[in-house]
């Protein structure tokens, strides 16, 4: 991510983008099963642009604090969908709850100054990014 202020931010954003990419690939069979479109919605580019603008305009903790309500709403929404979904789809539906909870964990741990903020995301990746060397 070219707007990253430093290598650590670049790693964080890269890891979260990797989680998004792998999740989209994992969901495609589920989407096909229900006749849902496989192409990405045009709104995702606009959402990314909004996140980039917020990152550029705010210090790290303010940026994270601004994301928190949105991510919390995603967790709630996917939990409701999982609760309403059929038993045969629970693995996929629950995986989306876990996916969103990884973002909550990242935000909460970063805001608390704790290490391992990306652990919940990394454990879901088949192709994790290499951790940058610290000086």
Predicted features and spans:
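Non-heme di-metal
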Residues: 1-135
């Amino acid at each position: 991510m070219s707007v990253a202020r430093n290598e650590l931010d670049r790693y964080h954003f890269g890891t979260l983008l990797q989680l998004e990419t792998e999740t989209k690939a994992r969901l495609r069979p589920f989407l096909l099963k229900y006749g849902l479109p496989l192409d990405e919605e045009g709104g995702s580019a606009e959402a990314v642009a909004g996140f980039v603008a917020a990152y550029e305009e705010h210090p790290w903790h303010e940026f994270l604090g601004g994301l928190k309500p949105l991510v919390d709403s995603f967790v709630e929404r996917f939990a409701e969908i999982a609760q309403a979904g059929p038993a045969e789809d629970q693995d996929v539906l629950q995986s989306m709850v876990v996916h969103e909870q990884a973002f909550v964990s990242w935000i909460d741990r970063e805001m608390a100054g704790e290490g391992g903020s990306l652990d919940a995301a990394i454990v879901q990746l088949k192709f994790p990014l290499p951790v940058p060397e610290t000086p």
